[in-house]
């Protein structure tokens, strides 16, 4: 019985890990996109330079979701807590 509760809590932790990481990444990417659109509307001449920084910012924000996915996969498949 105790193993089932521990496994259920691990699954909840994995779900929270990927869910919250995805939420944070979505907010970050939205913020980067909003800033890029506002900057492009103010000064259209800087579009090539702005695109580079926008893509870099979105990639860094997306890395948060990838870290959450890695943590979830470790919890589900290579869990050191189950022994």
Swiss-Prot record:
NCBIfam families: ATP_synt_c (TIGR01260)
Gene, per the UniProt record: atpE
Recorded GO CC terms: plasma membrane; proton-transporting ATP synthase complex; proton-transporting two-sector ATPase complex, proton-transporting domain
One example GO MF annotation: lipid binding
Membrane topology summary: Multi-pass membrane protein
Protein name: ATP synthase subunit c
Top-level taxon: Bacteria
Membrane-spanning intervals of the chain: 9-29, 51-71
Keyword set includes Cell inner membrane: yes
Keyword annotations: ATP synthesis, Cell inner membrane, Cell membrane, CF(0), Hydrogen ion transport, Ion transport, Lipid-binding, Membrane, Transmembrane, Transmembrane helix, Transport
Gene3D superfamilies on file: F1F0 ATP synthase subunit C
UniProt subcellular location: Cell inner membrane
UniProt keyword Ion transport, yes or no: yes
Quaternary organization: F-type ATPases have 2 components, F(1) - the catalytic core - and F(0) - the membrane proton channel. F(1) has five subunits: alpha(3), beta(3), gamma(1), delta(1), epsilon(1). F(0) has three main subunits: a(1), b(2) and c(10-14). The alpha and beta chains form an alternating ring which encloses part of the gamma chain. F(1) is attached to F(0) by a central stalk formed by the gamma and epsilon chains, while a peripheral stalk is formed by the delta and b chains.
Family: Belongs to the ATPase C chain family.
Species this chain originates from: Desulfotalea psychrophila (strain LSv54 / DSM 12343)
Site (Reversibly protonated during proton transport): 62
Pfam assignment, any one: ATP-synt_C
Alphabetical list of SUPFAM superfamilies matching this protein: F1F0 ATP synthase subunit C
Function: F(1)F(0) ATP synthase produces ATP from ADP in the presence of a proton or sodium gradient. F-type ATPases consist of two structural domains, F(1) containing the extramembraneous catalytic core and F(0) containing the membrane proton channel, linked together by a central stalk and a peripheral stalk. During catalysis, ATP synthesis in the catalytic domain of F(1) is coupled via a rotary mechanism of the central stalk subunits to proton translocation.
